Amino acid sequence: MSVSALSPTRLPGSLSGLLQVAALLGLLLLLLKAAQLYLHRQWLLRALQQFPCPPFHWLLGHSREFQNDQELERIQKWVEKFPGACPWWLSGNKARLLVYDPDYLKVILGRSDPKAPRNYKLMTPWIGYGLLLLDGQTWFQHRRMLTPAFHYDILKPYVGLMVDSVQIMLDRWEQLISQDSSLEIFQHVSLMTLDTIMKCAFSYQGSVQLDRNSHSYIQAINDLNNLVFYRARNVFHQSDFLYRLSPEGRLFHRACQLAHEHTDRVIQQRKAQLQQEGELEKVRRKRRLDFLDVLLFAKMENGSSLSDQDLRAEVDTFMFEGHDTTASGVSWIFYALATHPEHQHRCREEIQGLLGDGASITWEHLDQMPYTTMCIKEALRLYPPVPSVTRQLSKPVTFPDGRSLPKGVILFLSIYGLHYNPKVWQNPEVFDPFRFAPDSAYHSHAFLPFSGGARNCIGKQFAMRELKVAVALTLVRFELLPDPTRIPIPIARVVLKSKNGIHLRLRKLH
């Protein structure tokens, strides 16, 4: 009698055979993956061979040199040692070219290469595909659609709203300060810049500085800054599935929820306002619309309105970009002036001479403070709010010095490295506002606090106006002094932050 193929006596042998086949397939896949990684490493070595760099570990790359938030310090050292650009190996088969030469940056920013998708995709659950992350024709359409929201006619009335937000912050400071005590200012400045963007761009009535719910949004943005930065540098967190299972992934998901709840509330409130009698007609009579109204009334080239997903992505993007980068700029400018009292005093004299006894400030005043503007620009050079951007070459490039790169290489455009490049700026660590005197000359791409080229910051003029208003009104009311016991340590995140906060002592004037 024959024995069935499914009988118990045959099962162990069949199972053993299946396991052997599975093990063989697994080994084959591992070998194929290893070969793929090896070939990619060899391609990178050939692609970057014209650019010297420090020795790196075959598996870990330069990662050991960038531990404990030493990225900015390490970049400064490489800028001094390796002219123009330097390969940065994140691991044995993953590298990007660190670029900090103005001629190189002029070439790259003058092209239409996309942002490096792997780097920026980590931000998509947070801000979606808005202007920051879009590429190609869709980016061009959105940019053209939003540009009217930043016309001078729109920006002029915003000065009064900026003044209101800054004065609320300064009133709060008067209540908090005591003799010789210091204040961590970044949180306060973040609320002020969020207040400003809400009033100016989103038609918000009231002040988020007086609303406790806004504090959770600020904390969520701070958490997202840190989480995106650390995830980009953790090889085990590149998988979305594995990241969602980790404690960091769960915190990221919760922070995204908090940020989205805030922006959804803003959109729904404005939509509700537009349903009120007379409000829609009032908006239609405006010569130019503010940011949110541009989005709500927008028509794409095919005649369709923005989808809810696209609308929220643009609001999330501008809510973050419009307040967090400016908060970084204002806070570091205050610190720079606090540590250079002679320049702070001269700025105050200029502002007092302009405003007289009153503290009101107008659009016209903002172009009549040359020395204060010089100090603001020098602080932005030392502390660029966005320390870097990335690009992935869509075609080969040859730089002015003859060195070239093939298609596919990822470039890390270090604004921070550029601003500390001693071949571009003499004594780059010295605070010297006269670098930006009206008669001074410097390379067109030597100073890029708002990036450059077609993808420069769309809100550049808005941000500069806000910086000037904040500095002018603050210096009229307070003397800024450093806290020698808590010197801020700049660290690279999506936005330039301080590892230990920015603490200043404030002395009320008059």
UniProtKB/Swiss-Prot annotation:
Task: Mention one GO biological process in which this protein takes part, according to its record.
Answer: icosanoid biosynthetic process
What is the topology of this protein in the membrane according to its UniProt annotation? Single-pass membrane protein
- Flavoprotein among keywords: no
* Residues that hold heme according to the record: 321, 457
The record's GO CC annotations read: endoplasmic reticulum membrane
What coarse category fits the chief subcellular location reported for this protein? Answer: endoplasmic reticulum
Mind listing the UniProt keywords for this protein, alphabetically?
A: Endoplasmic reticulum, Heme, Iron, Membrane, Metal-binding, Microsome, Monooxygenase, Oxidoreductase, Transmembrane, Transmembrane helix
Q: Which residues form the propeptide?
A: 1-4
Describe how expression is induced or repressed: P450 can be induced to high levels in liver and other tissues by various foreign compounds, including drugs, pesticides, and carcinogens.
Q: What is its EC number?
A: 1.14.14.1
Transmembrane intervals: 11-31
Q: Where in the cell is it found?
A: Endoplasmic reticulum membrane; Microsome membrane
The GO terms describing molecular function are: alkane 1-monooxygenase activity; arachidonate monooxygenase activity; heme binding; iron ion binding; oxidoreductase activity, acting on paired donors, with incorporation or reduction of molecular oxygen, reduced flavin or flavoprotein as one donor, and incorporation of one atom of oxygen
- Its top-level enzyme class, in one word, is oxidoreductase
Entry keyword annotation includes Transmembrane helix: yes
Catalyzed reaction equations: an organic molecule + reduced [NADPH--hemoprotein reductase] + O2 = an alcohol + oxidized [NADPH--hemoprotein reductase] + H2O + H(+)
Q: Do you know which SUPFAM superfamilies this protein is assigned to?
A: Cytochrome P450 (SSF48264)
Q: Which cofactors?
A: heme
> Known PANTHER family for this protein?
CYTOCHROME P450 4A11-RELATED (PTHR24291:SF39), CYTOCHROME P450 FAMILY 4 (PTHR24291)
What's its job? Cytochromes P450 are a group of heme-thiolate monooxygenases. In liver microsomes, this enzyme is involved in an NADPH-dependent electron transport pathway. It oxidizes a variety of structurally unrelated compounds, including steroids, fatty acids, and xenobiotics. Catalyzes the omega- and (omega-1)-hydroxylation of fatty acids.
Q: What family is reported?
A: Belongs to the cytochrome P450 family.
Q: What is this protein called?
A: Cytochrome P450 4A4
Please spell out the taxonomic lineage of the organism that makes this protein.
Answer: Eukaryota, Metazoa, Chordata, Craniata, Vertebrata
Gene designation per UniProt: CYP4A4
